[in-house]
Amino acid sequence: KERFLIMNLILDDGYQFGLGAFETIPVYQGRPVWLEAHERRLRHTLEYLGIDLSSDWENHLWEYVYGMDKEDWVLKKITSDKNINFTSRANLYASMADRPGYVIALSSIRRNETSPLVRHKTFNYGDSILAKRQARAEGIDEPIFCNMQGQLTEGAVSNLFFIKNGRLYTPPVEAGLLPGIIRSYLCQCYDVIEKPLYPEDIRTFDECFLTNSLMGLMPVRRFGTVAFPVSSETQTAALFRRYEADKSLPFPFSIRRAGERPGRPCPSR
């Protein structure tokens, strides 16, 4: 059941026109995971929208967190010009051991790579929500968007990764996507190749997975008609185990592991 904390909600430009931002943060053992990274991204978006973040937001956040009677849950912070609100809910993503792998497919909706809003986590999520609903009705776990040039970008609520010959590949931010927190983590921990990718490239890769802050890393077993392996022996599974060990550490990581192959432990930091 979702729990809300509404603090004198005012119908400002955020709630009337979408000029607001939010962050969805997993809480693990009573602590928000990589809160600093989420707050940094939130501040960046609010600055772009011309919104000042309240000086006492952190006190409200911790008051809300400490008021919860459970250790593992999802915290959502919703911010606009005149509002700061929090909600909580359960994290419904299964553990890696119980994950059969996602089935994903291309959406008919295109990402507009020329829009600056696509790179920010704003209230403007209509395309993603509608595409997600349609995909689920068709038995698809996550729709994947191409941009106006036909390049792969991201999922409705996830970033997209591939593995080929032990190397990680992901579309660049310039393709028109939100730079996710787990995406940033992987790009700092491993020598990720960011390059334009097209639908015809999908079948050339060995593995595929999605990322976001709640799922961590989600293996993909089928992308359209292309099947990928899903097991505890894949490099995707090894990456997930590394993430599970790392998520209790501070973010960001200061060392980029050039040449580090997926699945190998990151050097001590």
Model-derived features with residue positions:
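Helix-start/capping segments and mature chain N-termini
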Residues: E2-L53, N59-Y66, N83-E260, C266-R269
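Ordered, amphipathic secondary-structure segments that act as subunit-interaction surfaces
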Residues: K70-D81, N85
